[in-house]
Amino acid sequence: ILFKYIIRWPWFVASVIICMACAWIYLKQSTPAYNINASILIKDEKKGGMLGSEFSGLEDLGLLNPSKNIDNEIEILQSKSLIKDVINELGLYIDYTTSTGFKTRDLYGASPILAHYSPKDAELLDAPMLLTVDYQKSGQIEVNVTTGKGSDEEKTFSKSFTELPAVLSGEKGTITFMPNSQVPITEDGKLEITIQHPLAVAKSYRKALAIGPTSKTTSVATISISNTNKKRGEDFINKLVEMYNRDANDDKNEVAQNTARFIDAVSY
């Protein structure tokens, strides 16, 4: 029996080599995912949050009923509307990549050419828009545009520009191409720009987002998100916290103004 296996040793060696080669190719092509974490003190009136101490007297009189608790605030933090605002603010509905061999590299914050396409126009897209940009050191670019990608209404057209900035107008709106001052063009190259509906992008970010309280006795919540680009994940969480706090302060000011008007009316 041993002899039968020995005479077939080349097959075993070949199998091991093939498996190792497949594993190496997979590791080279796969994109690592980063887990980004942060903590936030969220608004919670029941635990002495932004409004609890200021309006507790009115609450006792039944004039103010702050029903929001930490669970409500977590729902606000991971709401599609707030996440979509973050997507629009950071322009995350526009994605930049480049292909080298079999691998696609993410160019978030590192694209030599930036595309501006308004969120309002992006919200009218029924399917992703794909732009393939061939650029030269001289500043010349050739843009191939595919609209309605993957749908029955898929259309393709191209246009060349001799310099940047350049404006491309079409039935799907206007796209402005700008040079990235932080990433100068030093050689000819090619990149792909994908523009999607902001709500579709917001849904994917919401799916990758996890928010929860650190304990039952605290108003501190942890926020974590998995993203293939560490800087993009950090920017997303920072902007999410910033916009949540901004909205919370606006709510606080509105309640304070309405309460002041009510007190003035009662006094009068």
Language-model region placement:
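Hydrophobic and amphipathic membrane-targeting/association helices
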Residues: 1-268
